[in-house]
Amino acid sequence: MVSRKAVAALLLVHVTAMLASQTEAFVPIFTYSELQRMQERERNRGHKKSLSVQQRSDAAAAPRPAEPTLEEENGRMQLTAPVEIGMRMNSRQLEKYRAALEAAERAVHPDAPSRPCWPAGGESGWSGEPSPT
């Protein structure tokens, strides 16, 4: 006969696996106290920045030059290579967000022919690339 502890452990593993499959892979990375600490740090940084901006605005009474300064040039993000954005969805997520994905596709490509961009069967692991066949 199987011991009660073994049955309880198997039941706990089974319930945990079911809950994990229902959350669609959402796992909190930070604890509540860590989030509070990070928010407090951001507030402190924002307060310090607002003070330094106010001091700079008081000191800079002269009009700004038409050309950007070296500091502003360095502050801009410049892309050196093309950026590719993608995502992976399982069949359940595809069905759940199908209407929103189709609307987004129509917004980006209004003149494209209306055709589904994923398999009708909702194959798992679809990544957006066309199949090699």
From Swiss-Prot:
Molecular function via GO: hormone activity; motilin receptor binding
Signal peptide interval: 1-25
Gene encoding the protein: MLN
Record organism: Oryctolagus cuniculus (Rabbit)
Localization (cell): Secreted
Low complexity: compositionally biased ranges: 118-133
Pfam families per UniProt: Motilin_assoc, Motilin_ghrelin
Family designation: Belongs to the motilin family.
Chain's role: Plays an important role in the regulation of interdigestive gastrointestinal motility and indirectly causes rhythmic contraction of duodenal and colonic smooth muscle.
Principal subcellular localisation of the protein: secreted
A single Gene Ontology CC term: extracellular region
Region named Disordered: 38-78, 105-133
Sorted UniProt keywords: Cleavage on pair of basic residues, Hormone, Secreted, Signal
Protein name in UniProt: Promotilin
